[in-house]
């Protein structure tokens, strides 16, 4: 198939210098091209401080002098068409720095990279994939996800499941093989979205994908770019959305990467007080430079347009917003007003979210922001950052700390579990139980829980009940939906054999039932960030460590009452205030034997009585099971 001619025009250079060339990835990088009837590859790279740039690779036996690039204009872009180069060719840019160094750099815009520990870029063609997800894409752009169910399965492909027979030490499934397994699992469990960790190319497995060298390349650990397209396509066909972890906060310092790319700091800030993360040993992007902002904004659009991704979860937003994040005195510089806010990063978020909101309203931007920064999900015109959702890290912290307590002491910290509702309407929240909570000696979710094994799993079930009843979208890291007992490690697969154990199978079945209810009843998602969608029945029964509340929908039909007991005690004839005199039907009892419980029963139907209790005119009474 003959390719059109690729070239970099003066208009391309101008827009890139302005920071508004959102198709720049179609010009910079390596692109199959035809010039004067001759097929080959057009190479383009931004290296404004280089004395010279040459292309080296398998096509010229890595000859360092044979293919010098031409500098195009004053913007620092270099270009060269090389006849005869084909897809699959490995290459690098040889940068001659002004201080005399020779730098062997991978292509920042490459779409495919050599399998690690190799560091070369690979010529590839990402056009021409036969997408079959048009129905999904059309429906996506019409949805208001604030009013839709969102239950996210956070997943690391390399450790989800290991391949027993692929002949490698890592045992990675490729994207296509993984698709066959993950699609079936997510459909069975009723998750709405999957959030994939570590997709952008990165050299070190132990970074989990958070120290990136190839922002425009799906990692070759699991196959080719079109293999990754296949994965997204299959997920969409199954009705599952795809969110990627995206890391604009910092990047890896590996020699072949972006750091000191042309001998000087062009992607990072040259002052280490602004350009380095001492805590992480990484470089910080220079958000005040137009070309850098362009690189990042175009990258988000690249995943959206070329790979049909449905959203990005922006990692470490707090580290971008605060100039002194993770730094000691003397390691940071204040802004022009003398404060610690990173004004350039704030403007970058405005730029990113305004471009996305204005063109692709169905595409989600999700902030992992761990402080109380205001208006993260407010519109940019309302002095907000413009994100679609924010992880509720405060809820996560309070939830985990409370659930770790021995039930005897929970009454003393009762309001930790109610506090998040006091600020729930301030942002569009996602409730995350993510990978960060099951590593570094924090224990898996089930092993955070107190007591003997049966108590631990009962705690987990009632904890998940609280999570799914609480306002906010949901996120569970892989393995936590069946009670993975070991902490997560990127080096090994989940302990799937545990599904043969009664307690693990019980939790797995229970989470499946919660997800089914969550998707069925609009009361559980339609008014998440609105006080009209939530009403406490009794938030104050610290003595019994119980909570009761009602979730509501706009129609007023099928509102749901939650009653939760956070102790191992069975509270007999327990009274719960209710809003109306009506018959209340049991939907789910976490103490059923099929969930691994002790089998304490709750009546299938209970009629409310005219017995005022806790500010309500009506109430119901029943035996409330332990951890039920």
Residues of each region from the PLM?
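Carbohydrate-interacting/catalytic domains
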Residues: 1-149, 176-186, 190, 454-457, ...
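Short, flexible loop/turn elements at secondary-structure junctions
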Residues: 47-49, 73, 84, 156-161, ...
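Short glycine-biased active-site loop of nucleotidyltransferases that positions the nucleotide triphosphate
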Residues: 70, 204-209, 253-260, 377-378, ...
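Short catalytic/ligand-binding loop motif for oxyanion handling, primarily in non-cytosolic enzymes
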Residues: 101-103, 161-163, 202-205, 250-254, ...
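Substrate-binding/active-site clefts of carbohydrate-active enzymes
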Residues: 114, 134-147, 156-341, 622
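Soluble or luminal CAZymes and related metallo-dependent hydrolases
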Residues: 174-178, 224-227, 291-296, 341-348, ...
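Conserved alpha/beta catalytic core and glycan-binding cleft of carbohydrate-active enzymes
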Residues: 308-310, 328-490, 498, 519-576, ...
């Amino acid at each position: 198939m003959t390719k059109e001619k690729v070239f970099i025009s003066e208009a391309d250079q101008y827009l890139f210098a302005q920071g508004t060339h959102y198709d720049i990835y179609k010009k910079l990088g390596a692109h199959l091209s035809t010039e004067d009837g001759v097929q080959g590859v057009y190479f383009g790279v931004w290296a404004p401080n280089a004395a010279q740039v040459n292309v080296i690779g398998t096509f010229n036996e890595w000859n360092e002098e044979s293919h010098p690039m031409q500098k195009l204009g004053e913007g620092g872009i270099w270009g060269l068409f090389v006849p005869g180069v084909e897809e699959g060719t490995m290459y690098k840019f040889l940068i001659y720095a002004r201080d005399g160094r020779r730098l062997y750099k991978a292509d920042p815009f490459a779409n495919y990279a050599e399998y690690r520990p190799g560091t070369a870029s690979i010529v590839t063609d990402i056009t021409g994939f036969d997408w079959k997800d048009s129905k999904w894409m059309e429906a996506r752009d019409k949805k208001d996800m604030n009013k839709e169910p969102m239950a996210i399965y956070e997943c690391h492909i390399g450790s989800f499941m290991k391949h027993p027979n692929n002949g490698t030490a890592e045992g990675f499934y490729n994207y296509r093989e993984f698709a066959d397994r993950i699609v079936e699992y997510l459909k069975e469990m009723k998750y709405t979205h999957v959030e994939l960790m570590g997709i952008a190319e990165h050299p070190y497995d132990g970074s989990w994908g958070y120290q990136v060298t190839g922002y425009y390349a799906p990692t070759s650990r699991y196959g080719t770019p079109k293999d990754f397209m296949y994965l997204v396509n299959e997920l969409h066909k199954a009705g599952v959305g795809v969110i990627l972890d995206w890391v604009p906060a910092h990047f890896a310092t590996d020699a072949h990467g972006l750091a000191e790319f042309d001998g000087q700091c062009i992607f990072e800030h040259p002052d280490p007080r602004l350009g380095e993360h001492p805590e992480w040993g990484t470089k910080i992007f220079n958000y005040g430079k137009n070309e850098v902002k362009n690189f990042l904004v175009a990258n988000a659009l690249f995943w959206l347009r070329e790979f049909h991704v449905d959203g990005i979860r922006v990692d470490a937003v707090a580290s971008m917003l605060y100039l002194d994040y993770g730094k000691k005195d003397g390691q940071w510089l204040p802004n022009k007003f003398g404060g610690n806010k990173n004004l350039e990063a704030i403007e970058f978020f405005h730029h990113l979210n305004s471009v996305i909101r204005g063109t692709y309203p169905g595409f989600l931007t999700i902030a992992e922001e761990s402080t109380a920064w205001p208006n993260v999900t407010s519109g940019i015109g309302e002095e907000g950052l413009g994100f679609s959702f924010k992880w509720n890290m405060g809820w996560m912290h309070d939830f985990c700390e409370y659930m770790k307590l021995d039930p005897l002491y929970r009454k003393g910290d009762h309001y930790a579990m109610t506090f998040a509702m006091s600020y729930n309407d301030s942002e569009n929240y996602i409730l995350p139980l993510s990978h960060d909570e099951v590593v570094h000696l924090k224990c898996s979710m089930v092993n955070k829980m107190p007591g003997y094994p049966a108590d631990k799993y009962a705690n987990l079930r009632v904890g998940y009940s609280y999570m799914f009843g609480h306002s906010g979208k949901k996120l569970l890291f892989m393995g936590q939906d069946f009670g993975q007992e070991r902490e997560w490690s990127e080096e090994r697969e989940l302990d799937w054999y545990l599904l043969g154990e009664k307690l693990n199978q019980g939790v797995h079945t229970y989470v499946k039932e919660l997800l089914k209810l969550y998707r069925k009843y609009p009361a559980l998602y339609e008014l998440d960030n609105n006080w009209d969608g939530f009403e406490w029945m009794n938030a104050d029964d610290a003595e019994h460590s119980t909570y009761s509340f009602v979730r509501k929908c706009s129609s007023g039909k099928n509102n749901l009452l939650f009653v939760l007991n956070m102790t191992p005690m069975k509270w007999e004839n327990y009274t719960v205030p209710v809003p109306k005199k009506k018959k209340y039907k049991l939907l789910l009892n976490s103490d059923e034997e099929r969930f691994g419980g002790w089998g304490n029963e709750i009546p299938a139907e209970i009629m409310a009585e005219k017995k005022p209790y806790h500010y309500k005119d009506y109430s119901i009474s029943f035996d409330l099971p332990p951890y039920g």
